[in-house]
Amino acid sequence: MMYSENDSSIYIASVLGARLKRIRLNLDMTQAEVANKAWVSRRTVLNAEKGDAKLSDLIAILGALNMLN
């Protein structure tokens, strides 16, 4: 089966989302807490954890999770 560049982008986004969720849970934070700290909506955090987020939102969420060191 051939994979397109879009397929790999979708895969990378889903892996990144799963990692964001794992980090959040390891920090014992709720989606609402991350959203509040990142100045985004809880829905934005939820979507990011599903692999669907804008780069600016990902950066804000990573900052809220103290991952931009």
Question: Where are each of the predicted segments found?
Answer:
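Short helix-to-coil "ATP-lid" hinge immediately C-terminal to the conserved N-box Asn in the Bergerat
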Residues: 25
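Short alpha-helical DNA-recognition segment
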Residues: 28-44
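N-terminal flexible/basic segments that precede or flank functional cores
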Residues: 1-14
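Residue-level signal for the short linker/turn that defines the boundary of a DNA-recognition helix
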Residues: 18, 28-29, 53-56
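DNA major-groove recognition helix of helix-turn-helix/homeodomain DNA-binding modules
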Residues: 53-69
